[in-house]
Amino acid sequence: GIGDMLKVATDYKAKVFGVALKDRASILPAGHAANAAYWWDTSAGHFITSTYYMNQLPEWVKKFNKTIQVKPGTDVKGVPDGVTKTFQMAKAVLDNEHLGEGPVTDMLAISISSTDIIGHAYGTRGKENYDVYMRTDEELAKFLTYLDSKVGKGNYLFFLSADHGGMHNANVMKQHKIPADGYAAWNEIKPLNAAFKEKYGIEKVA
């Protein structure tokens, strides 16, 4: 990945970090050699990392987590506030790890997971999807303004990408006579559990 290639190109002097709500969305863009990847732990109500990167969270992360802590189990990933918390963490990484302050190019990979989760759940036309993109636009504007003041205009390269698009809710498409349907996975859960119980004695797998 880009993070690993940047490490190699700078003789491993570059600082590379990943931030996202989903673990894979933070880990994969940052790469194998990243300094750290941080993601949201719903069961803890704050950001965490893995012992692959470090044995314990840095003190600054512990202090930051106290400022954004929510009740364990609260859904942050599937709401617009997840976007805000992602950018708050990204800004905290930028500040506390002193990215962009040295002679070597650093990299901060930020993945916005809430748009993906909400898009899958509600489709592209839902109010929920509108809300999360409005929040993303707002937070992105604030973050770019911060980069201008912190790193300086012309001193950073910013690029925006996506791993996939979205589609309308199947019910909306059918209203407009477009052949479409949804897969009701929950209809398969009962027979799946019954099959596993009969064959393996396992009470519940899903």
Language model features by range: what are they?
Residues 31, 122, 170-174:
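Outer-membrane beta-barrel and related beta-rich outer-membrane complex signature
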Residues 56-58, 64-70, 127, 141-206:
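Secreted, luminal/periplasmic, and some membrane-associated catalytic domains
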Residues 1-104, 113-120:
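His/Asp/Glu-rich, glycine-adjacent segments
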